[in-house]
Amino acid sequence: MLTSMVKEHHKEQAKRKQEQEVRRKEAIEASNELTQSLVDTLNVGVAQAYLNQKRLDAEAKQLHLGATNFAKQTHQWLQLIDQFSTALKDLGDVENWARSIEGDMHTINQTLELAYKASRATQTSSGAGTSLEASTSASASANPSAT
């Protein structure tokens, strides 16, 4: 009876040991599955973050290129505006010069008219007809707008 009890006890221990081993293997397998699932979940997040970062880098590069092109275009526009401003200033200078010349021409014209009238008045009072024609033609050739 004692030997049968010892055998039965060893049998029970072996059975429990076997069940523990099965449970340990199941626990290890479940732990591995959980770990793999967590790694996969984290990898998806990391992969998404990596893709987002690549996209952000590409967009930042495009934005930088756009800003650089905009700065170049703005600089060109500023140069054109400066050139236009200089051209307008030059036109204003030419206009002032033309007005000055026009005023001088009016003064010269008035002076020539007065000189012509004075010479004509002197000639009519002296009565020289031939010299009058000569002075008239000389005045007319000197001042074509007076005739």
Curated annotation (Swiss-Prot):
Any one Gene Ontology cellular component term annotated for this protein: neuromuscular junction
Region (Disordered): 1-25, 125-147
Pfam family, one: GCN5L1
InterPro entries linked to this entry: BLOC1S1
Effect of a null allele: Show reduced eye pigmentation.
Biological processes, Gene Ontology terms: autophagosome-lysosome fusion; endosomal transport; eye pigment granule organization; neuromuscular synaptic transmission; olfactory learning; regulation of synaptic vesicle cycle; synapse organization; synaptic vesicle recycling via endosome
Superkingdom of the organism of origin: Eukaryota
Family per similarity comment: Belongs to the BLOC1S1 family.
Assembly: Component of the biogenesis of lysosome-related organelles complex-1 (BLOC-1) composed of Blos1, Blos2, Blos3, Blos4, Dysb, Muted, Pldn and Snapin. Interacts with Pldn.
Free-text function comment from the UniProt entry: Component of the biogenesis of lysosome-related organelles complex-1 (BLOC-1) involved in pigment granule biogenesis and membrane trafficking in synapses. In response to high synaptic activity at neuromuscular junctions, stabilizes Pldn protein levels and, together with Pldn, plays a role in promoting efficient synaptic vesicle recycling and re-formation through early endosomes.
Protein name: Biogenesis of lysosome-related organelles complex 1 subunit 1
The organism's taxonomic lineage, starting at the top: Eukaryota, Metazoa, Ecdysozoa, Arthropoda, Hexapoda
